[in-house]
Structure formats: structure tokens, C-alpha cells
From Swiss-Prot:
GO molecular function: undecaprenyl-diphosphatase activity
Protein name, per record: Undecaprenyl-diphosphatase
Oxidoreductase recorded as keyword: no
Taxonomic placement: Bacteria, Bacillati, Actinomycetota, Actinomycetes, Micrococcales
Protein task: Catalyzes the dephosphorylation of undecaprenyl diphosphate (UPP). Confers resistance to bacitracin.
Major localisation: membrane
Cellular component, GO annotation: plasma membrane
Length: 277
């Protein structure tokens, strides 16, 4: 049965990682309804995110290769540091610092108190409303070529909020981008690129801790976690393409309503005792 549960959670991770609905919240909630019931754990969540981030690398590989190449050449002076791709490399590095620092400082809290379903439900609703406001009032005039240091730092701190399940890594970053005046597509694209260093660092660190015996593997074996990760990769790749096409033509209102309704449902389930925090 654990294999089936791992497959289900891999599907959930792949379906929700790139949507502004919080994949960690969904893994936490869905895990409670599975036969073995309970929180899949921060390690399982971080490791399966390696699958979805690999999908990002495959989907945006041309952009990533170009950014890395131009950034590296800018270090030797062979490319002007004002080159858009070289600047993007520096901005991604700069924007990764907030989540790296806060992730280390708050590690114990992230793996315990932050995983309460009461907090998850609250964040789903609150940041759903933030996304609604940002989508409505954002000027949507800026493109990634307009990114500067101030905005890179803003994106970085917004991404750091995703350490709390229910916020959503993409949702928090996209919301910040919209508030800073970026288009829906630009905000989403940068959110996906910015997440790569943070997610790979977190996932590999959690994988190391499990393999080194520093933390228990949790409910699922490494084999089951690996299967979930592969499934998350395949499904996530398909979702990226769909999502980028969707937001090029529509607003984020669908995801706003989904977050609010899901958060409200979790509150009801907690209040009636069907779910435990």
C-alpha cells in the first residue's frame, strides 16, 4: 500500500508544484487521507521536489544554458556584466540568499510548528487574497529585462515565505512580481528559474541527511520516495507547459478561488475532527 501512496503523492507534487496553490500544503493535506495517514514529512517533500525542479531544467534548458554561459563569461570580462543574461545569473544568486539563510535559521520550526494544518489553511487563504490583489492592481508593464537589484531582493524574500506550507513558492514569488509591475508570464518564468538553486540545495541536503542516517526516512522508503520523485518529474513537466500557456491568456482568479475554498475546507475538517493538525 505504501507504494500506491507514494505514487499518489508523486502525482500531487507534480500537479501542484508549479501552480500557485502550494505543493507542500497539498502533500500535507492529501497525506492525512491516505491509509497510513499523516504528514509525509519535510524530507519527503524536499526530495520529491528534486523531480519537479529537474522538469524546470528540462523545460527551460535553453534559457538556463544561456544564463550560465553569459554569467560565467562576465566573470572573466569576456561579456559585459550589463548583458541581460549575465545580470539574470547574478539576480538569481542574489535572490536565493533570503531562503537559504532563513531556511537554515528556521530549520527546526519549518520541520515542526510550520507544518501544522491550522497554519497551512490560514496561509492558503491569506496568500490567495494577496495573489488576487496583486493580479488586480499590478500594472503588468515590466518584463524580465527590467529586473534590477531591488526587485531581485524582493523576489528573493517572497520566495522565502514558501518555507511555510500553504504560501506556495511560485505563488509567493509571482505575487511579488505582479505587485512590482511585472507581467504574469514574466513573474511566473522568473519564479521557476529562481527556485532552482533553493529547491536543489534543500532537496539534496534532505537526501544526504536521510542517506547518512541523520534523520529517519519517514513513512516511505527511499525506493518509494524515488518513484514519487520520478512521477513528480513527468507530471510536472506537462504542467509547466500548460500553466505558461494558461496565464498568457487568463488571470490567476481560478487559483485564488481554489486556494480560498481549499483553506476553508481544511478549517472545517479540522474543526469537526476529521483532520488533526
Amino acid at each position: 500500500m505504501n507504494w500506491i501512496e507514494a505514487i499518489i503523492l508523486g502525482l500531487v507534487q507534480g500537479l501542484t508544484e508549479f501552480l500557485p496553490v502550494s505543493s507542500s500544503a497539498h502533500l500535507r493535506i492529501v497525506g492525512e487521507f491516505l491509509p497510513h495517514g499523516g504528514d509525509p514529512g519535510a524530507a519527503f517533500t524536499a526530495i520529491t521536489q528534486l523531480g519537479t525542479e529537474t522538469a524546470v531544467i528540462l523545460f527551460f534548458w535553453r534559457d538556463i544554458v544561456r544564463i550560465i554561459k553569459q554569467w560565467a563569461l562576465s566573470l572573466t570580462g569576456r561579456v559585459d556584466r550589463k548583458d541581460p543574461d549575465a545580470r539574470m545569473g547574478w539576480f538569481i544568486i542574489l535572490g536565493s540568499f533570503p531562503i537559504a539563510v532563513l531556511g537554515l535559521l528556521l530549520q527546526d520550526v519549518i520541520e515542526t510548528q510550520f507544518r501544522s494544518l491550522w497554519i497551512t489553511a490560514t496561509m492558503l487563504i491569506v496568500f490567495g487574497l494577496f495573489l488576487a490583489v496583486a493580479d488586480h492592481v499590478g500594472k503588468q508593464e515590466r518584463h524580465l529585462e527590467d529586473l534590477d537589484v531591488k526587485h531581485a531582493v524582493g523576489y528573493g524574500f517572497a520566495q522565502a515565505l514558501a518555507l511555510i506550507p500553504g504560501v506556495s513558492r511560485s505563488g509567493g514569488t509571482i505575487t511579488a512580481g505582479l505587485l512590482m509591475g511585472y507581467t504574469r508570464a514574466a513573474a511566473a518564468r522568473y519564479a521557476f528559474l529562481l527556485a532552482i538553486p533553493a529547491v536543489f540545495s534543500s532537496g539534496l541536503y534532505e537526501l544526504y541527511k536521510v542517506l547518512a542516517g541523520k534523520v529517519p526516512a519517514g513513512i516511505y522508503t527511499m525506493g518509494q520516495t524515488a518513484v514519487a520523485t520520478v512521477i513528480a518529474f513527468a507530471v510536472g513537466y506537462l504542467i509547466i507547459g500548460w500553466f505558461m500557456h494558461y496565464i498568457s491568456e487568463r488571470s490567476y482568479s481560478l487559483f485564488v478561488w481554489y486556494r480560498i475554498l481549499l483553506g476553508a475546507a481544511v478549517f472545517v475538517l479540522l474543526g469537526t475532527g476529521i483532520l488533526t493538525a
